[in-house]
Amino acid sequence: MLDLLIELLNRDVTQAVDYFYANDVQRQIVQNKVTAINETKALALFDKYKKGAVIDEDQVFEFYKDLGIDMETDIVTFMFSYNMQVKDKQLVMGEYTKEEFIQGCKNLGVDDLAGWKGKIATMRADLKNDNKFKDMYKFVFGFACEKGMKSIDIDTAVALWPTLLGNRCKFMDKWVSFIQEKAEKKEITIMTKDTWDLFFDLVQ
């Protein structure tokens, strides 16, 4: 599979995209299941961590620290962020807006810190569900994009892949080395969503 993807990338990214769709790989659409919550309590929780109008990177770290989660190494944080999606709006890595945080509370059916803690086991179980993990993986691409961008830089991609897929991909080191060599030669300068998504399916 690695050889196939390398061959496709060496030819043309368009061919990789054609392969992606020809094999009936379907993109998943997130369907939020909204649960009634005490929105006043949820807003109070947001206010506890917000800095200005958003929960910024430092405060996001504090939020997950209070949940007993290491934000730097535990990918369950991506699953929580995945559940904070607001329709037609792209989340920004390292911050949660009020709208996103409250949406996450509604989607998970929680309105306080204890409720969030109670969902950790569920989020970990979702990481073991292939379909949910795939949805989360695809979400991370947009999550990692800078505002207004439709691609991510190579350094970000090669940092995220081992974290997300290290336990699933036997050839991760070779893949990362290949991408880094391509980047050093200026043969690739960005990572597109199509290649990001295709890599997941080849890993499977």
Model segments located where?
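Conserved, structured regulatory domains from eukaryotic proteins
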Residues: 122-145
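Conserved active-site beta-strand-loop modules that form the wall/rim of enzyme catalytic pockets
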Residues: 147-149
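Short, amphipathic alpha-helical interaction segments embedded in low-complexity terminal/linker regions
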Residues: 1-121, 128-131, 152-155, 159-203
